[in-house]
């Protein structure tokens, strides 16, 4: 066989001509979504058929690898147009049509991933091609396709392949239904004004009033978190916490059990002992034993800190019960946690979150945040007035490289809750930044979706400090999408190892704990005054408040995830309750089933929730080694970060990117110090007022 016709030298590099076209559209009817889904499947299948039916002697880079890469670019964009509206469209009909499209396309994805004929031709190409004739990223793409083929069992007997295909299709549908149930949940609880004691006026004014005069509290984040933090009526907190962790209890509990069973079956067919081992093969951690050791060691280090914090909380509860004439049961309940953790911030660190949020109107935060990111990463953002989107609240921005003026991408901001909308905060990649069929560069487009408190007649949207942190985090993912310069869609943006994917955006959370960035994105919504420096200093000092309990809870969630995907007979609710008691020291509320509300289990983080903590090892190392040492707003370090960490996307291993940015292998020291733990004789001392 001759060497492939299109080799390394023929492929365009990052300096390729750039196409600034936004191919996305959001005006499709439910019928059009259905029709376009069918058309997309037919068009894409034709390409796979052409690749899979070619004679082996005709297999070349152009006819096989490039053909698959090109169709992936088109397919990804068109698929996102069809399946993204299920998360954000204000129309229930559109959301339903989009969900159905996602199900059909997910089934089609499984069919295409199980094409043994295509796999055989990719293997043939690898055996015949001269390795040095491929550009490094093309070689990586070829290797990845073969790896994915083996992970789908395409080297196994046909009967086994059919079993795997059947399981994969069922898993896709179950995951879609699990998260659809949560998105469409409309549960609310009615309360009197007295039952909502302790909540600020702007919160109460934002609640819908019912015919009987009671106020309607939903289980969406802008209602749930403020109430759990500030309502001084324990019974109200109990009802809301219980309802929140009983959402979709029956239907999602059944789905979760089936998910866990099917994942285990598929993994065994592929020769893996557990689903966790199957998933982790592609991650930095590699094995479930490595993850278990990481979580166990961290839990052991954090437990003494958690015990101290529980003692403080219990004393706060005793004092409050005495002050309000309430019975004191001598125990911390699940509905007490956020309330008294908030009190720790207010009493030990003198941070009044209600006062603080008056300095974080969303427009001021947005302006400051965008300014910091532009300065740090050498970018310039421009708001596109009147751009079409899926809702009137949504804003579209263009991002350019500040030095060259070249467009690097676009991003949508969709910040406020709506009925039926995705209920958390997330970044959705909508158009991958990669090379098109003609060698020109397609710009990346992403959407940041959040659920911040909506403006009222009396006040703009005011953000809690933890919402500002969330904003910084998710926008970090947006920047990862836009700044990557991969050649292949498969490696664009955040397509890195799952236990590294959070590190770039976690690293950027540090800016909301630094004085200069905080001053730049805050201003009192009435007076326009800056945050008093004393309040700012107390906020920064409060970063380590409750760090033991917060991180022990993260370990609980990670361990639940690992348990479900290493022990198929584990009962999700029982496992969660056991770990809450053992690790956190706070029992789960009887009758609840938190895992049935845990969207990560059906949202691509199966056996990988540990990645949030694992990624922090790298995010803290990057921040303290470079930015903290050389300046948190140092644009040279920012450009190094853009070049070394964001630019490659998934075209390199994360370990190689980290070594290049840090100048050495990563270390855990900064991570442990950030958790309030002693490292080499240094122990951070939280300051109190």
UniProtKB/Swiss-Prot annotation:
Protein name per UniProt: Thimet oligopeptidase
Catalytic machinery residues: 474
Similarity annotation: Belongs to the peptidase M3 family.
Gene for this chain: THOP1
Organism of provenance: Homo sapiens
Pfam families: Peptidase_M3
Protein origin, superkingdom: Eukaryota
Residue positions, PTM Phosphotyrosine: 278
Gene Ontology terms describing biological process: peptide metabolic process; protein polyubiquitination; proteolysis
N6-acetyllysine: residues carrying this PTM: 257, 538
Note describing how the cofactor binds: Binds 1 zinc ion per subunit.
Subunit structure: Monomer.
Annotated keywords: Acetylation, Cytoplasm, Hydrolase, Metal-binding, Metalloprotease, Phosphoprotein, Protease, Zinc
Positions with a binding annotation for Zn(2+): 473, 477, 480
Disulfide bonds: none
Top-rank EC class of the record's enzyme: hydrolase
Function: Involved in the metabolism of neuropeptides under 20 amino acid residues long. Involved in cytoplasmic peptide degradation. Able to degrade the amyloid-beta precursor protein and generate amyloidogenic fragments. Also acts as a regulator of cannabinoid signaling pathway by mediating degradation of hemopressin, an antagonist peptide of the cannabinoid receptor CNR1.
């Amino acid at each position: 066989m001759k060497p492939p016709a299109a080799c390394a030298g023929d492929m365009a590099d990052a300096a390729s001509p750039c196409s600034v076209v936004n191919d996305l559209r959001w005006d499709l009817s439910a019928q059009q979504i259905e029709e376009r889904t069918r058309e997309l499947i037919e068009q894409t299948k034709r390409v796979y058929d052409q690749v899979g039916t070619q004679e082996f002697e005709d297999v070349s880079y152009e006819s096989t690898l490039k053909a698959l890469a090109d169709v992936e670019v088109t397919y990804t964009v068109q698929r996102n147009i069809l399946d993204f509206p299920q998360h954000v469209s204000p129309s229930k009909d559109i959301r339903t049509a989009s969900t159905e499209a996602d199900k059909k396309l997910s089934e089609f994805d499984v069919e295409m991933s199980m094409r043994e004929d295509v796999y055989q031709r990719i293997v043939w190409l690898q055996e015949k091609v001269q390795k040095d004739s491929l550009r490094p990223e093309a070689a990586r793409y070829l290797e990845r396709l073969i790896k994915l083929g083996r992970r789908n069992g395409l080297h196994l007997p046909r009967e086994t392949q059919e079993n795997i295909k059947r399981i994969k299709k069922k898993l896709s549908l179950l995951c879609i239904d699990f998260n659809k149930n949560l998105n469409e949940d409309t549960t609310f609880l009615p309360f009197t004004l007295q039952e909502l004691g302790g909540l600020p006026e702007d919160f109460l004014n934002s609640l819908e009033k019912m015919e009987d005069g009671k106020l309607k509290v939903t289980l969406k984040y802008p209602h749930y978190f403020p109430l759990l933090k500030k309502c001084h009526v324990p019974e109200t907190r109990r009802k809301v916490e219980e309802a929140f962790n009983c959402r979709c209890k029956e239907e999602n509990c059944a789905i979760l059990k089936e998910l866990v069973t099917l994942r285990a079956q598929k993994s065994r067919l592929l020769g893996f002992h557990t689903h966790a081992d199957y998933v982790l093969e592609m991650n930095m951690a590699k094995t479930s034993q490595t993850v278990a050791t990481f979580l166990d060691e961290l839990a052991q280090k954090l437990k003494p800190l958690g015990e101290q914090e529980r003692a403080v909380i219990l004393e706060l509860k005793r004092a409050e019960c005495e002050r309000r004439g309430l019975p004191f049961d001598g125990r911390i309940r699940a509905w007490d946690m956020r309330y008294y953790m908030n009190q720790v911030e207010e009493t030990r660190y003198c941070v009044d979150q209600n006062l603080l949020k008056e300095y974080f109107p969303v427009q001021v935060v947005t302006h400051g945040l965008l300014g910091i990111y532009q300065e740090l990463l050498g970018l310039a953002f421009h708001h596109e007035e009147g751009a079409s989107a899926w809702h009137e609240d949504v804003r579209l921005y263009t991002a350019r490289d500040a030095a060259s003026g070249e467009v690097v991408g676009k991003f949508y901001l969709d910040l406020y809750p709506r009925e039926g909308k995705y209920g958390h905060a997330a970044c959705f990649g909508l158009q991958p930044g990669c090379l098109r069929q003609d060698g020109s560069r397609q710009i990346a487009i992403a959407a940041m979706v959040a659920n911040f408190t909506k403006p009222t007649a009396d006040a703009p949207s005011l953000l809690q400090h933890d919402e500002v942190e969330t904003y910084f985090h998710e926008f970090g993912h947006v920047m990862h999408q836009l700044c990557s310069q991969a050649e292949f869609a498969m490696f664009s943006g955040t397509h890195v190892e799952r236990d590294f994917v959070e590190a770039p955006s976690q690293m950027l959370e540090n800016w909301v704990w630094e004085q200069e960035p905080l001053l730049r994105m805050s201003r009192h919504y009435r007076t326009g005054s800056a945050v008093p420096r004393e309040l700012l200093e107390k906020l920064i000092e409060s970063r380590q408040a409750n760090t033991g309990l917060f991180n022990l809870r993260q370990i609980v969630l990670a361990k639940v995830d690992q348990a479900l995907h290493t022990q198929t007979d584990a009962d999700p609710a029982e496992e969660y309750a056991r770990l809450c008691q053992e690790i956190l020291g706070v029992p789960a509320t009887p009758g609840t089933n938190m895992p049935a509300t845990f969207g990560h289990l059906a949202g691509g983080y199966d056996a990988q929730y540990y990645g949030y903590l694992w990624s922090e090892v790298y995010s803290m190392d990057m921040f303290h080694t470079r930015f903290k040492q050389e300046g948190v707003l140092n644009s040279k370090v920012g450009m190094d970060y853009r070049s070394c960490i964001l630019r490659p996307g998934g075209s390199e291993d994360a370990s190689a990117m980290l070594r290049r940015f840090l100048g050495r292998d990563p270390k855990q020291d900064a991570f442990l110090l950030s958790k309030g733990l002693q490292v080499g004789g240094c122990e951070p001392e939280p300051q109190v007022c």
